[in-house]
Structures are given as C-alpha cells and as structure tokens.
Amino acid sequence: MKSLKMLYPLFMLLVLSSKIDLSNQDVIDNILMSLSKGITYFDMQGSNINLDGVVGYIILQAQLREATRTWPHSDFLSLSQRAAAISMLKRLSKSLSTAASTLQETDPKYFKEFEPILDSSFWSLPGEWSSTDPSLVYTSVRAMECYDEHMSDKCMTFLLGTWKDNGTPCIVTKTCRDTMTQFGCPHYSLSHQLLYFMIGTMKGCSKMLKGDLRLSRVNITVGHYKRIFCSNMMKSNQDIFKNSLTGQMQDIFIENILLCGLVGFSDFYKLDWLQSILTWQDQEAGCFGKEEDISHIFEEFLDAPHKRVKRREKTLTDGCSSHMTGVAVSALGGFLNFYLSEQDITKRPII
C-alpha cells in the first residue's frame, strides 16, 4: 500500500503531462478538485495551523470571492464549477473564523502584529497582467539569505502600524529600506523583499522610498522594485524546476508563484508548473509537504530555532507542512483566477 501511495505523484504527473491540450475548463476542474481537498484538510486541521498557513487560506478566501464574482457564465459546466467554488468559499469562511480565534489565543503576540493581513479585504488582486523581464536578473546572487525573519517581521510591522499599540503605520526606517532594496538576495529574503513592498502598497504607504538618496536608485519606483524582484524570482523558479524540484525547494517555488502572481505577473502561471504542484498534494490528507522535512530550509531565515513553530514553519502531527499547505492553496487560487481571466479577452496579458 505504501509503495502504491509513493507511485501516485508519478502517475499523476504522467497523466497530467499527457494532456497538453487541456482546455481552460479542464484545468479549472483540476484546480477546484485540489482546492476542495485543501479546504477539507483545513476544516479538520485549521486550529493547528500556524499564522503563515492561515494567511495562505486568507488569501485563498479573497481569491475565491473574486473568482465567484467574475466567473464567466458561458455554459452549464461553467455554472456548476462556480457553484462548487461558492460552496468551498462558504466552508472556508467558517473554518477561518475558528482558526483565527485559535491563533489569537495560542499565539497572541504574532496575531496582534499581523492581524491586519488576517483579513481577506487587505489583499488586493491584480486587475491586469504583465510579464517579468529577463534583463533585470542579477549577475550574481548571494549564497546565504540577506537577513533573518526577525528583521523581516519588524520592518513589516512598521508598515502595518502594529509595532506598538496604536502605532503609526507606514514607517520606513533607513535599515528597513536599505535591507528591503538590497539586490542579489536569494530564496526567502528575496520573496520577502517583494512581500514588504506588497504590504506597503496594500496598506496605502505612498512614500516608501522617500529619503533614499542613492543616486543609483533615484529613478527606481516601487513598481520597478516589484518587477526586479519578480524577474529574479522567475529565474529562481526556472532553475528550481529544471534542477531540483524536491521537497526542499518546492516551498520557495510555490511561494514565488503566489506572490508574483498577486502582483500581476502572469508568466508565473505556467501549466507545467501547475501540473507539478498538483502532484505534490497528499491525495488522502489534502495537504502539502507531507513526509518531506522542509523545516531545515528555513534555518537561515530564522533568528532562533525556537521560532520555527511560531510563524515560518510548523510540521503538523500528521506530517504535513503548515507553511507549504498555506502557500500552495493560495497559489492555486491565483491559478484559478488567471485561467478564468483567460476566458475574458479584456484581461489577457499585456505584451
């Protein structure tokens, strides 16, 4: 039985890769089936999932709301797919309420610091699509992370205004600005540089680069930084997909798709990438990262080992990864909205 279970991802990959001519509705069906399993898992384990995992499901909630709002009513199949999405959204909303209450009780400090992003209305979805630029890829990348999770959290709470009770939002210290605009960062420090600017934009912080006196950066806008980071995250994903699609790198691969997709870079929504992600889901539990020890890939990004279970990673009792499950379902929500927009010629990618 164990051997059959281990062969399932390979079987799925062969089946999916053989369907090169999948229609958008076929792809949407596959995404909805995967999301249904992921939400069923959250129904059962939501109270045990950490903050990062819950944020992933919060983003999925925003994506499902947008999907059901804009779903093309073209035929019976499309209507039945929308009905399935509405049903999942109702289930998810109920489970999220319970999960948020549990987080507030079990992890009050982190809950308070990141409470604003635990509301799906905080997250804005792309209104139009763009593509990354290979010419913006760094000539060299650091071997180690540029900063740790403590620094990342601190800078983001300055933007959110949660660094103290009734704190002023949109504070950008020189240290945070210099850290979050440093070029050549890899992995999680790169994706969190993008997340920093995403949070600032969604919070309404319009002067994030004010005071940057570096002549080499004088013409670089927030939008340009996002394009630089996502262009490098695209290169990272291409390298990962080509060389090392193991449990160790799957998490960062999916996180890059999630974040850059939210910024509006449609070239992250590649069909073969989606097909691979679908094979990584445990078909019985509905989670991601099961039986893969991915916790060690966060070590550089953590300022102390004991924080591993707080936000960045938590391996649940069933062996599933809290972080990877959260980013995977929200990335799949992004794929869903992209393929729905592909049926709407007004939302086709901008060349």
From Swiss-Prot:
It holds the Pfam family DUF4735. The keyword Amino-acid biosynthesis does not apply. One of its GO terms (cellular component) is extracellular region. InterPro entries: DUF4735. Residues 1-25 form the signal peptide. Keywords: Secreted, Signal. Belongs to the UPF0764 family. PANTHER family: UPF0764 PROTEIN C16ORF89. Homodimer. This is UPF0764 protein C16orf89 homolog. It comes from Danio rerio (Zebrafish). The lineage of its organism: Eukaryota, Metazoa, Chordata, Craniata, Vertebrata.
